[in-house]
Curated annotation (Swiss-Prot):
Subunit note: U1 snRNP is composed of the 7 core Sm proteins B/B', D1, D2, D3, E, F and G that assemble in a heptameric protein ring on the Sm site of the small nuclear RNA to form the core snRNP, and at least 3 U1 snRNP-specific proteins U1-70K, U1-A and U1-C. U1-C interacts with U1 snRNA and the 5' splice-site region of the pre-mRNA.
Compartments in which it is found: Nucleus
Name this polypeptide is given: U1 small nuclear ribonucleoprotein C
Main subcellular location: nucleus
InterPro entries linked: Matrin/U1-C_Znf_C2H2, Matrin/U1-like-C_Znf_C2H2, U1-CZ_Znf_C2H2, U1_snRNP-C, Znf_C2H2_sf
Entries under Gene3D superfamilies matching the protein: Classic Zinc Finger
GO CC term, one of those recorded: U1 snRNP
Keywords annotated in UniProt: Metal-binding, Nucleus, Ribonucleoprotein, RNA-binding, Zinc, Zinc-finger
Similarity-based family: Belongs to the U1 small nuclear ribonucleoprotein C family.
The keyword Iron-sulfur is assigned to this record: no
One BP term from GO: spliceosomal snRNP assembly
PANTHER family linked to this entry: U1 SMALL NUCLEAR RIBONUCLEOPROTEIN C (PTHR31148:SF1)
């Protein structure tokens, strides 16, 4: 059974099971030793944290931003064979590859509007006509 060594505490763990290692890493002595380790690391002169004054840190500090990664060919439109492969294809192609026809777009479905229930229809002319008759009847009297 392997023994596990804690570099922060400088001890070999007596319980090498995952539960024993987890319990050790959550302990007070381990946490204080870990904090002390990183504080000592920052105090040493060779370790200088990067300073970005009002700037965003570079994503890839060592690489120039070219749009593509080194070693990769740039992106090309579909259906075009890269220049270096034209003569390297076995059998050789007589010319450029004809373009592939576009994928047909399916016709959109006709929207279905549900019918209203027959009892819910309101006939505005009928209500207006009855209102007109009532007012004319009251004025005629």
């Amino acid at each position: 059974m392997p023994k596990f060594y804690c570099e922060y505490c400088s001890i070999y763990l007596t319980h090498s099971s995952p539960a024993g290692r987890k319990q050790h890493s959550q302990g007070r002595k381990h946490i204080s030793a870990k904090v002390e380790y990183f504080q000592r690391l920052v105090r040493e002169q060779f370790f200088q944290p990067p300073v970005f004054l009002g700037q965003t840190p570079p994503i890839f500090p060592g690489l120039p931003m070219m749009g593509v990664f080194p070693g990769f060919t740039p992106l090309q439109p579909p259906n075009i064979i890269p220049q270096g492969l034209m003569n390297g294809i076995p059998g050789g192609l007589p010319g450029p590859v004809p373009p592939v026809p576009p994928v047909p777009v399916p016709m959109p479905a006709i929207p279905v509007i549900p019918n209203e229930p027959p009892n819910m229809k309101i006939d505005l002319n009928q209500h207006n006509a009855s209102g007109v008759n009532n007012t004319s009847a009251t004025t005629a009297q």
